[in-house]
């Protein structure tokens, strides 16, 4: 079996198990192409092939780690069908430096949305309509950027005040409540941006391209808004995903200030944000503690057991 077919077989098995496997598939296709260019024969995956692919380019340590994990799955699959395959190390040779997510301050959020809201209208682009609503969905509902860009018109129920998330990171959909203010924003946006719904079924779409907005475009626009708002952009700094972080931290701040039992409310936040377990949600407690120590200190005595301590890798 040629290596590209082996990759296809693995991808099919992961899809059958309910996994998206998109990023991993892209990595493994790149690895198969690397092996083809280097002339490695089918039937085996050598140490030379694996390490040349993983460590032969100047990649970020997090990217190397991601590629290692993808290749380990391919190697396991290859060994299962009788190939002689080298298993890459379980931990990257490059030290991973954890970069904590950036949380925008209240003032930065205010400046950012003021900038987004006052973009000039254009006959060539609908971004002045799209972006105020799109970025408010990220900040006001805590969606991942992929979830927001995959929203379709029927997924928004302004009268009920809900959003239906079809295409989630973990492959499981969910329906979430939204505030009346966000529901009204989306209702007004839909009326203005979709006067003829048949133009596009996607909630956020590019009028010029006639298709859904992609993540690269969203990121490029976000960087422009940061610059206009006087918010520095740097590695590990503000990113569209920072708005999702901001949603989580804002809710935790509100709950802590109100004396809520964090052990009770964390599962609700995890479900709302589409986390498969509490680990990701608990991490937002750490962010809240770091960014707003005066707020989180109120809960430390009663709920300190649910606030995770950074691991050595995170420190």
Regions found by a protein language model. Name each.
Residues 1-315:
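Conserved catalytic core of the tyrosine transesterase superfamily
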């Amino acid at each position: 079996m040629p290596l590209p077919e082996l990759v296809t077989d693995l991808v099919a098995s992961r899809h059958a198990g309910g996994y998206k496997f998109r990023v991993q598939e892209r990595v493994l296709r790149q690895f198969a192409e690397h092996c083809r260019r280097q002339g490695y024969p089918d039937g085996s995956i050598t140490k030379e092939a694996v390490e040349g692919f993983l460590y032969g380019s100047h990649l970020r340590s997090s990217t190397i780690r991601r590629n290692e994990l993808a290749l380990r799955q391919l190697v396991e699959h290859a060994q299962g069908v009788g190939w002689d395959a080298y298993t890459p190390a379980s931990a990257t040779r490059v030290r991973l430096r954890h970069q904590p997510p950036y949380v925008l301050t209240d003032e930065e959020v205010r400046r950012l949305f003021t900038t987004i809201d006052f973009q000039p209208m254009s006959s060539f682009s609908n971004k002045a309509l799209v972006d105020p609503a799109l970025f408010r969905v990220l900040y006001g509902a805590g969606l991942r950027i992929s979830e927001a860009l995959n929203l379709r018109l029927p997924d928004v129920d302004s009268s009920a005040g809900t959003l239906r998330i079809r295409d989630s990171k973990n492959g499981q959909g969910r329906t979430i409540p939204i505030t009346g203010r966000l529901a009204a924003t989306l209702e007004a946006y839909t009326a203005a941006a979709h006067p003829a719904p048949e133009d596009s079924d996607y909630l956020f779409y590019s009028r010029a391209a006639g298709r859904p907005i992609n993540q690269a475009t969203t990121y490029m626009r976000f960087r422009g808004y940061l610059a206009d708002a006087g918010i520095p952009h740097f590695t590990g700094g503000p990113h569209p995903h920072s708005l999702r972080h901001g949603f989580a931290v804002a809710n935790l701040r509100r709950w802590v200030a109100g004396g809520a039992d964090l052990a009770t409310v964390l599962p609700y936040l995890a479900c709302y944000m589409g986390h498969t377990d509490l680990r990701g949600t608990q991490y937002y407690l750490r962010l809240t503690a770091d960014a707003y120590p005066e707020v989180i200190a109120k809960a430390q005595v009663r709920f300190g057991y649910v606030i995770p301590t950074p691991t050595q890798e995170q420190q």
